[in-house]
Regions:
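Glycine-rich and polybasic anion-binding loops at the starts of cofactor/ligand-binding domains
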Residues: 2-258
Length: 258
């Protein structure tokens, strides 16, 4: 009986909302392919610190030295020369849904993200192609010392927290696509919960890949100190296209004792 109810709930999901395609508008798109020049341009576009560029270039060298893992599915038709590794949407990051362009707002409305935030979430991040376009967190969490920001902001504003953990749980040498991720990562989330703090409502990050022929490479890093806890939800979706898209995100989760 329980299995029948579970199947019914899954079957009742309206999957058509995921397949609605938006017109692709961007303010910057990197050249297709994977070269040192492209990596440098992505890093410059993001105005990253030098240490992060060096991490990217190291990962690129590792990527070039590794074969596709033998346990991977057949992806022989995947050609990185035909993948857009970085697409910046035609908007900067907003803290209010109503400030987003209408097409992006409509996308997340269909997916139910704004409604979920109103009802049951302590914070929300929403990424569209390569960049987080919306991010908001309740004031109460900030007052408790909880950090929940997009990963680009974390790299620039919380470097002392990021550097000891970034790339330590999932290393670029883990496999070829881990190396690819670290070479071209963009977007994602950073969560830090101080010692003894209990985050009572969930945090959620949602990643929408809209452009055909694009890749999405968000990085999520979560640090939960001793005696603390939080509930983090991550979701993603993309329309169906007749060209190859690639998703190679990474999540690193560090939970201290207690």
């Amino acid at each position: 009986m329980a299995e029948e109810k579970k199947k019914s709930r899954i079957d009742d999901i309206n999957r058509s909302v995921y397949d609605i395609k938006d017109e692709v508008e961007f303010s910057y798109k990197a050249d297709r392919g994977l070269t040192e020049d492209i990596i440098r341009k992505i890093s410059a576009e993001k105005e990253e610190p030098a240490w992060m560029l060096e991490k990217r270039l190291q990962a690129l060298r590792i990527y070039e030295s590794l074969d596709v893992p033998p346990w991977a599915p057949d992806i022989s038709e995947l050609d990185m020369d035909h993948i857009d590794t970085y697409i910046r949407p035609k908007t900067d990051r907003k803290a209010r849904w109503e400030d987003l362009p209408q097409n992006i707002r409509d996308t997340f409305d269909r997916l139910g993200i704004p409604e979920a935030e109103k009802k049951s979430l302590a914070g929300v991040g929403a990424q569209y192609d390569s960049e987080v376009v919306y991010h908001n967190v309740q004031k109460e969490l900030k007052e408790q010392g909880v950090i929940y920001v997009d990963f680009e902001t974390a790299v620039k504003e919380y470097e002392d927290l990021i550097k000891p953990y970034f790339g330590q749980l999932i290393t670029p040498r883990y496999h070829k696509f881990a190396a690819l991720h670290y070479a071209v990562w963009s977007g994602g989330s950073f969560v830090y919960v101080p010692k003894g703090v209990h985050v009572r409502m969930p945090l959620q990050s949602y990643f929408r890949l809209n452009a055909p022929g694009a890749g999405q490479f968000e990085h999520t890093l979560i640090i939960v100190e001793e005696g603390a806890d939080c509930h983090f939800i991550e979701g993603c979706s993309a329309p169906r296209y007749n060209v190859a898209n690639l998703h190679a995100g990474a999540v690193e989760l560090f939970v201290k004792k207690g």
